[in-house]
Structure formats: C-alpha cells, structure tokens
Curated annotation (Swiss-Prot):
InterPro entries the UniProt entry points to: PSII_Ycf12_core-subunit (IPR010284)
Membrane topology: Single-pass membrane protein
Organism ancestry: Eukaryota, Viridiplantae, Streptophyta, Charophyceae, Charales
Annotated protein name in UniProt: Photosystem II reaction center protein Psb30
The protein's assembly and partners: PSII is composed of 1 copy each of membrane proteins PsbA, PsbB, PsbC, PsbD, PsbE, PsbF, PsbH, PsbI, PsbJ, PsbK, PsbL, PsbM, PsbT, PsbX, PsbY, PsbZ, Psb30/Ycf12, peripheral proteins of the oxygen-evolving complex and a large number of cofactors. It forms dimeric complexes.
Highest rank taxon of the organism: Eukaryota
Length: 33
C-alpha cells in the first residue's frame, strides 16, 4: 500500500471517530449552558 492510500484511510477513520465526539461535546456544552 502506498503512503497516500494509508493517509486517506487514516483521515477517513479520524473523521468517523471525531465526528460523533465533536457533536457530543457540543451537545454537552449546550446542555450545560
């Protein structure tokens, strides 16, 4: 596998993992405020 493919897969995984995390943090902030 080339480095470019690995980088694309890594960025995709990051988006999939961080997406719900960020939404949860924003929801928690709104709930606290």
């Amino acid at each position: 596998m080339s480095i470019e493919v690995i980088a694309q897969l890594a960025s995709l995984a990051l988006i999939i993992v961080l997406g719900p995390l960020v939404i949860g943090l924003l929801a928690a902030r709104k709930g606290n405020l």
